[in-house]
Amino acid sequence: MENERVARALINGMASVIRGKQDFIENFIITVLARGHLLLEDFPGLGKTTAAKTFARLISDSEGSVLTFKRIQFTPDLLPYDITGVDIFDTESRSFRFVPGPIFANIVLADEINRTTPKVQSALLEVMAEGQVTVGNVTRRPADPFMVIATQNPVESEGIFPLPVAELDRFMMRLSLGYPEREAELSVLNENPSERLLPLVKPIVTTQDLRSAQDATDEIFCHPDLKGAIADIVRSTRTAKGVVLGASPRAG
């Protein structure tokens, strides 16, 4: 499948469930093609989980199976190994056996990520930045493709742990679905997308198609003048009044 058709197919596939949010969907797919991670900051019930599940169902592997999807509900009592996995001693073989955690899924939904402690939040840093998971003395690769979609409620102020700058820097975009327009909200009432439309979503793109489209983004020509303008914008955030901490070079 041509790379442009891959992007269009994914956009149309998500639009079949997520109604009236074209800008959100396009930015979602841009992040996917750039191999980035997403932070969704929005109120409950606006479709964050549905969006993540829909995307996972649109892509199949070489055997026709959809991408694996895991949802991690972040709570104050969550532990790092609940995310990464743990080595368990097998009494029969008298050796340690690794039990992988949900971070080894293709699409990982980190739900309400700011409700757990910084120690647990940091369990995501290595895999998001370096594409690897270290448990004990062994380093393992996550699934391919791999993406973290984290959510947080923008109005909560009690019982939360704001994301540290180091972790915020791992997300390519921070998006908000927002409330739908009246017609789109009526469509949600009539169709109940998460229960009626989501099960109907079938794979329309293979992992090979997705990798090809992702590789193509690395070949896009960017004029030196445009790169210079991007660098100037990023650098200006570090001296702008009212900005506590400017953007890192990663933002470019």
PLM features: residue spans?
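Pre-Walker A (pre-P-loop) alpha-helix and adjacent loop at the N terminus of AAA/AAA+ ATPase modules
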Residues: E2-L46, R235
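P-loop (Walker A) phosphate-binding loop of NTP-binding proteins
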Residues: F43, I83, T151
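Canonical AAA+ ATPase core
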Residues: D90-R94, T116, V120, M128-I220
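Walker A/P-loop
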Residues: V32-T75
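Conserved NTP-binding/hydrolysis module of P-loop NTPases
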Residues: T75-R94
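Conserved alpha-helical scaffold flanking the Walker A/P-loop in AAA+ ATPase domains
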Residues: N27-I30, F89-L109
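Walker B catalytic acidic pair
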Residues: D42, D111-E112, A123
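C-terminal helical "lid" subdomain and adjoining coupling/linker elements of P-loop NTPases
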Residues: F221, T237-G252
